[in-house]
Amino acid sequence: MSKLFFVAFLCLIISVFATTPDEIGCTDISQAEFDEKNANCIKCGEEGFGEEMVKRCRNKCFTDNFYQSCVDQLNGVYEEKDTPPVKE
């Protein structure tokens, strides 16, 4: 289990160092804005969601709903949208 964790953590670290806006196709975003949004994605990955979370969070230059879900999760206001309402 520790080997699997190490590999996942290593992949996450590599993905952190290998990103600029141009590398993921975001040509209309400043480096400062990219760094801020990318840091949010990395935090989501570190929360136990892994490298796939980071990739999906960066999808479509952070304009995908997945990025907003990540930010909501970090802020503690995430609400599952696909679950049916609870009947009392």
Swiss-Prot record:
Tissues showing expression: Expressed by the venom gland.
Keywords for this protein: Secreted, Signal
Cellular component, GO annotation: extracellular region
Domain of life: Eukaryota
Broad class of the protein's primary localization: secreted
Localization per Swiss-Prot or TrEMBL: Secreted
Bilayer-crossing regions: none
Span of the signal peptide: 1-18
InterPro entries for the chain: Crust_neurohorm_sf (IPR035957)
Family classification: Belongs to the arthropod CHH/MIH/GIH/VIH hormone family.
Miscellaneous comment: Co-purifies with alpha-latrotoxin.
Biological role stated in the UniProt entry: May increase the toxicity of alpha-latrotoxin and/or other venom components. Is non-toxic to mice and to the cockroach Periplaneta americana.
Protein name: Alpha-latrotoxin associated low molecular weight protein
Taxonomic lineage from the root: Eukaryota, Metazoa, Ecdysozoa, Arthropoda, Chelicerata
